[in-house]
Amino acid sequence: MELLPPRGRAPPDSSLDSASLTSLDSSVFCSEGEGEPLALGDSFTVNVGGSRFVLSQQALSCFPHTRLGKLAVVVASCRRRGALAAVPSPLELCDDANPVDNEYFFDRSSQAFRYVLHYYRTGRLHVMEQLCALSFLQEIQYWGIDELSIDSCCRDRYFRRKELSETLDFKKDTEDQESQHESEQDFSQGRCPTIRQKLWNILEKPGSCTAARIFGVISIIFVAVSIVNMALMSAELSWLDPQLLEILEYVCISWFTGEFVLRFLCVRDRCRFLRKVPNIIDLLAILPFYITLLVESLSGSQTTQELENVGRIVQVLRLLRALRMLKLGRHSTGLRSLGMTITQCYEEVGLLLLFLSVGISIFSTVEYFAEQSIPDTTFTSVPCAWWWATTSMTTVGYGDIRPDTTTGKIVAFMCILSGILVLALPIAIINDRFSACYFTLKLKEAAVRQREALKKLTKNIATDSYISVNLRDVYARSIMEMLRLKGRERASTRSSGGDDFWF
C-alpha cells in the first residue's frame, strides 16, 4: 500500500519498517477510489516519532473519543474557520503543528502507533510483542484507547503480563529503596556522624565488612538459641536447671535489646524507624519479656483470683516470644519473599479460604447426617465434622475421626478429591508469585552489592594512585552475576508453566 506524503514534503524514508503497514487497510489513510486519492482537504498528516502517516478524517470520525478522533474534528473546525488558533486548538492534542503542510507532530513510539492504526481499521486492538505491558498501556492510554478494546486472542496474555509487571516493578522499587536508603544514611547531622555510619553499616549491611558478617552470624545464633531455650523452658526435664535457662533468656533479651537500641540511636528519622515492619517485629520480640517482669513485680500484693488472672496474662505474653523467629527475616531472603508474596496474593489467599470454607460446610453437613445413625460414631456433631472435613480437604487426614458407612466413605472420597482440586488452583499462582519475588530480591541484593563494591573500589583508586583496576571488568562481572540470577528466574518460571509471563 502506498502512503501519500503531503505536498512539499519528501516521501517517507524507505528504511522504515513497512512490512507491518502492508496489512493495514488503505481506508485508514487517504482513501483510494477508482485510482484517484481523495483531496488533501479530507486528510491530514501525523508525524509520530519521525514516521509520517496521511490519515483520513472519515476513518477517524468513527472513534470520536480517541485522541486522533478529536484531532480530526479540531482540524476540520480549523479549516472551516481558516485559522490554527481556533478553539479548541490542535496544539492541545499534539506536541507541535505545521498548518501550512497540515502536519501534526507526536513525540511517541512509531512502532506502537502502527497497532493504533490497525485499531482504527478494524476496531480491534492487538498486543505488540516487542514492548512490555505497562509501556504498551501507556501508549494506548495516550491515544485515548481503552485497554478493554484489546482483542480476546491477546487479552489474557496482556493482563497476565500487566499484573506481573506491576508486581515486579523493579525500577520503582529500586528508586524507593535508594531514596529510603539515602534518607536513613544521612549522618551528617547529629553527633558522631562517622561512628554512627560505621555502626549502621555493621547493623544493617551484613556483607559490607568482616565485622558486619560476624555480627550477622552472632545475631542469627542468638535468635536460634532463644527459640530453643523458649522450647526447653516449657518442658519439665529433670536434667535441666531452670535457673540456667532463665539466665540464658536474660542474655538473649539483653542482646536483642542492645541491638534494637543501637539501631534506634543511629537513625536520624526515628519516627519513621519505628513505623517499619522489621523494627516493629524486633520491638514485639522483646516487649513481652519486660511486660512480664512488670506484671509479676506488681502482682505481689494481689489476691488469689487476681493472681490467677495475672498468670493468664503472663502466659499470653510469653506466647508472643515466638515472634522472635521472624527476626530471621533480616537475614533470610526467603522469609522476606514469603512476606511479599502473602502481601501481594491476598486476593488469592482469600479465594483459597473461601473455597475451603464452602467445601468444609457442605461435606461436613453431609457426612454428619450420613454417620449420625451409627452407634459409637465419632461424628457427634457438625462442628466435629468440620474438623474432619478440614483435615480431609487439606489432605492431612489425622484419622481421629473417620467414616464407617459406605455412604460416608463415598462422601469422604469426594471431599478429598475436591480438596486436591481446590488447593491446586490458587497455590500454583502463589507459587509463581513467590518465585518471582524471591529472584527479584536476589537481583536487588546483587545490584546493591555490586554498587557498594564499585563505590568502594572507586574510593580506593582515588586515594591510592598505585592501584590499577579495570572498572570495565568489575562492571562486566556485576552484569554477568545479575544475568545469571535472571536466567535462573526465567528457568524457574518456565518450569512452573509461566512462559507467557516473560517477553
From Swiss-Prot:
It comes from the Eukaryota. Its main location: membrane. SMART domains: BTB. It is found in: Cell membrane. The chain crosses the membrane at residues 214-234, 247-267, 280-300, 313-334, 349-369, 410-430. GO terms for cellular component: membrane; voltage-gated potassium channel complex. Disulfide bonds: none annotated. It is a multi-pass membrane protein. Residues 1-213, 268-279, 335-348, 431-503 are cytoplasmic. Residues 235-246, 301-312 are extracellular. A motif (Selectivity filter) lies at residues 395-400. Gene3D superfamilies: 1.10.287.70, Potassium Channel Kv1.1, Chain A, Voltage-gated potassium channels. Chain C. InterPro entries: BTB/POZ_dom, Ion_trans_dom, K_chnl_volt-dep_Kv, K_chnl_volt-dep_Kv8.1, SKP1/BTB/POZ_sf, T1-type_BTB, VG_K_chnl, Volt_channel_dom_sf. The keyword Membrane applies. Heteromultimer with KCNB1 and KCNB2. Interacts with KCNC4 and KCND1. The segment S4 is probably the voltage-sensor and is characterized by a series of positively charged amino acids at every third position. Potassium channel subunit that does not form functional channels by itself. Modulates KCNB1 and KCNB2 channel activity by shifting the threshold for inactivation to more negative values and by slowing the rate of inactivation. Can down-regulate the channel activity of KCNB1, KCNB2, KCNC4 and KCND1, possibly by trapping them in intracellular membranes. This is Potassium voltage-gated channel subfamily V member 1. The gene is KCNV1.
